[in-house]
């Protein structure tokens, strides 16, 4: 069991994405970066997508990414537990989004897969 929003957790997510044919097919030809940050714990992780390959690693909060989602650990926990979906969390202000709205809408179905994979990892909070 991984501690949520830890390096161990994100390495497990990275492995699951790497072994997920749906994700690999959906991200063929895609080059993007997504930063996921907790505002109250000061942790940030960078998801790097490059033509079907995905890497996730700890990063500095100042690092720029094409898309960024930030919120409290509690907000991320609600997402992990399925109490709220990513879109609702952003629309309700639980998570703050930065990046191109038009482009994220184009990638929406692909990126929702990351949230689904995150929910599939056995967690401790």
Protein language model regions, located:
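Feature captures hydrophobic
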Residues: 1-125
């Amino acid at each position: 069991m991984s501690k949520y929003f830890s390096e161990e957790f994100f390495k497990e997510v990275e492995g699951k994405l790497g072994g997920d044919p749906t994700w690999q097919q959906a991200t063929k030809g895609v080059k993007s970066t997504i930063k996921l940050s907790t505002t109250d714990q000061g942790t940030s992780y960078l998801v790097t997508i490059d033509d079907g390959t995905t890497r996730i690693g700890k990063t500095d909060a100042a690092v720029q990414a094409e898309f960024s989602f930030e919120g409290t650990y509690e907000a991320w926990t609600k997402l992990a537990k399925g109490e709220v979906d990513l879109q609702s969390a952003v629309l309700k202000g639980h998570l703050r989004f930065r990046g191109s709205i038009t482009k994220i809408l184009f990638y929406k179905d692909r990126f929702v897969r990351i949230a689904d994979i995150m929910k599939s990892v056995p967690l401790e909070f």
